[in-house]
Amino acid sequence: MANAMFEVASGWGLRVDRGPNWLLVRVRSNHDGPPDNEPLAERLWHLMEEHFVYRLVLELDEVEVLDDLVIRQLERLDHVARDHGGFLRLCGLSRHNWQRVVRNGLGDVFYPYGDRKEAVFTFHPPHELRKEA
């Protein structure tokens, strides 16, 4: 897996690794500098387009608080990725951040993978498919 870069977007530190057909992005809150005007999800989408990869794993274990605006951005990013045959997986979420995702009504959209390996190699069907099974 190639180590691609470390960037800052919208007050977030992004460490990007590229694997076969995957982008793995470690996200951390960056309070050292002023945020730019580009939303986190938009920067992530640009990375996906730049690498022609629409499967994205976000490692969120270094994010203290995932706010509602960012959660909604990630929901939209998941929709766009799916429109391109990909998807977004979240891993390393704290219990508090996972509860925030659920409170935003997205517990059926995302699954709380433990780490990047689980996110890449384990399949958890969307909630709608789990109901039908």
Predicted regions and their residues:
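Short, flexible active-site-adjacent loop segments at beta-strand->alpha-helix junctions, enriched
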Residues: P20, S94, R116
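Intrinsically disordered, low-complexity segments enriched in polar/charged residues with Gly/Pro
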Residues: M1-A4, Q99-V101
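STAS-typified acidic loop motif
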Residues: A2-R43, L60
